[in-house]
Amino acid sequence: MIHPDPTLFGHDPWWLILAKAVGVFVFLVLTVLAAILIERKVLGRMQMRFGPNRVGPKGLLQSLADGIKLALKEGITPAGVDKPVYLLAPVISVIPAFLAFAVIPMGGEVSVFGHRTALQLTDLAVAVLYILAVTSVGVYGIVLAGWASGSTYPLLGGLRSSAQVVSYEIAMALSFATVFLYAGTMSTSGIVAAQTSTWYVFLLLPSFLVYVTSMVGETNRAPFDLPEAEGELVGGFHTEYSSLKFAMFMLAEYVNMTTVSALATTMFLGGWHAPWPISLWEGANSGWWPLLWFTAKVWVFLFVYIWLRGTLPRLRYDQFMAIGWKMLIPVSLAWIMIVATAHSLRTTGHGGWASGLLIAGTVLTFGLAVILWRTMRFRADRTVPARTAADVFPIPPIPGRAGTARTPESRETTDA
């Protein structure tokens, strides 16, 4: 197992840095094309229908065809928009999505034409904070798109998105605090190295669950896709966008999904380390093999995105905000105190801290699941209150019949 040497960063030749940057870009673009196609295929199977199956063998070129179609369509700019901001908003959304992936470790040390280098573009002492900061910039593009469109629905979608990111990024940052505490670093390569023996998903299960929930809300995906709710806001912040500008918003969304999935892999699933029992093979974590394990873990999270979209209905806005502020943030704060206590026992030489942390995390997770289930069941089982006199309205008398009062129920029966 060869972990990257921190001194390697910043000493690669220029052509190798350029090659790694192009490699990261190609990896993200290919992942987006594959994710769109697989999402449509999987959703088709979930809904008992065929997915795209016309362009290319078994529809494999459908995503490429859609991208070319959007690029060649006429770009329509509606009247009344703030044109400079309207055109700049998609760019502001898509650039931070790519920049955030620069510090994600995709593997250990490899040899490229005789040069030893890490499968990571660069690393920082505060790499995770860099990712949080850069991904937060992307929401400015959404807000500006809603404001510059000069329409009510896009503006509401932009405001929803800003509130959503602020709410769920707090919970996401709190879920990272426990990882920093145990890894002793905010460097992404250092966090991966700290998980050589045990992945943090087992030690820090509540943090992992909080992060997974937050990352779905952060990327505006179902069931948290409130900024672009079709039934309420038509298309949300990108209602007035078409052609390549619309494609840039879609590209930013799927790149963000890939980035937060890669971050979850790095923080909780051991990064590029091979899973058990593959890790028993001596060469599993050397050479180019770690890139395969890393990609497989990222695709597990991307499938979770697809699964959630195909199975869960969209939440109401008040329910969504209540989950963030009333559940995720308080649970994260309580869990940080528990983890800090266990970490203190660890540093002072007391045994049993790992077992205690596992038990505490399991109990907390189970308790939250029970509370959430009981809450949802109580809401579903509530009886509808009896209608008051205000709900009953008179109707004109029918010739030959006495005047009656008609209720909404009787109207539905009559109309049927």
From Swiss-Prot:
Keyword Cell membrane among record annotations: yes
EC numbers for this chain: 7.1.1.-
Membrane topology: Multi-pass membrane protein
Top-rank lineage group of the source organism: Bacteria
Chief site of localization: membrane
Localization per record: Cell membrane
GO biological processes: aerobic respiration
One GO CC term on file: plasma membrane
Residue ranges of the TM segments: 16-36, 84-104, 124-144, 165-185, 197-217, 260-280, 288-308, 320-340, 353-373
Subunit composition and interactions: NDH-1 is composed of 14 different subunits. Subunits NuoA, H, J, K, L, M, N constitute the membrane sector of the complex.
Name this polypeptide is given: NADH-quinone oxidoreductase subunit H
Chain's gene name: nuoH
